[in-house]
Regions:
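Alpha-helix-loop-beta-strand connector modules within alpha/beta enzyme cores
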Residues: 66-97, 142-162, 187
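Catalytic cores of alpha/beta
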Residues: 100-114
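Short, Lys/Arg-enriched N-terminal segments with co-localized hydrophobic residues
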Residues: 1-8
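Conserved N-terminal beta1-alpha1 strand-loop-helix module at the mouth
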Residues: 14-58, 69-73
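Active-site mouth loops of central-metabolism enzymes
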Residues: 23-42, 94-103, 133-140, 167-181
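Conserved, mostly hydrophobic/aromatic
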Residues: 28, 48, 108, 121, ...
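Glycine-rich, proline-tolerant flexible connector loops at the mouths of alpha/beta enzymes
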Residues: 54-80, 123-138, 169-173, 196-202
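N-terminal small/glycine-rich loop or linker at the start of catalytic domains
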Residues: 10-33, 122-135, 156-173
Length: 202
């Protein structure tokens, strides 16, 4: 950084503390060809909580025919909440589940009613239309409309909502993407009620 005479460097206001999260149980296993046993997923989730992680992404409530790795989403969530090892710690841990489409959100709402649903769900848009349609099956316009409908429903069920913006640096289908779209989508998430934002480069 080169400063010219008379210029001042902007002060960066770093937070005094951060909260560490882990997404291995969901993202780490998502593309594994073989099904990871529920016992193994539960063990890892418990160990991560015992290690001190306060935010954990544990599963995807999407269509198990499309995402067979997460056909145990309900069972894993039930067992985690009933865990003798970490059940008493869950009040201080935020559990997140992926919910790309409507049915996934409805499943988490049902799970909340039964006492084992996540604390937070995650929606995802891409700055690339092609990537977004491949990921969700909807156009960006239709997806935003869906989220505007389902964010209030999630809040009514007691869940926080994360709005993720993907392909902020580039798209495997379209190539380079415009960063201004990521900024625009971030603002849009906040405008429609998302509680927090994640940015992803995939």
């Amino acid at each position: 950084l080169i400063l010219r005479k008379g210029e001042k460097m902007a002060l960066l206001h770093y937070p005094k503390k951060v909260v560490l999260g882990d997404i291995t149980v969901r993202d780490g296993f998502q593309h594994e060809e073989k099904f990871i046993p529920t016992d193994a997923k539960l063990w890892l989730a418990e160990e991560l909580i015992l290690a001190g992680f306060k935010r954990l992404e544990v599963t995807n409530f999407g269509n198990p025919k499309v995402m067979p790795q997460f056909k145990d989403a309900d069972m894993l969530s039930k067992r985690l909440h009933a865990s003798k090892k970490v059940g008493h710690l869950l009040k201080d841990v935020e559990i997140t589940a992926i919910t790309i489409r409507e049915r996934a959100v409805e499943r988490t709402i049902e799970a909340r009613k039964e006492g084992y649903g996540p604390d937070r769900i995650l929606f995802m848009v891409s700055t690339s239309e092609s990537h977004h349609r491949t990921n969700s099956g909807l156009s960006l316009d239709d997806y935003w409309k869906m989220c505007e409908t389902y964010i209030p429903k999630a809040h009514d069920a007691g869940m926080k909502v994360c709005g993720t913006v993907s392909t902020i640096w580039g798209c495997p289908i379209e190539g380079p993407t415009e960063l201004k779209k990521a900024v625009e989508f971030t603002r849009r998430w906040l405008d429609i009620g998302a509680d927090d934002i994640e940015h992803a480069d995939h």
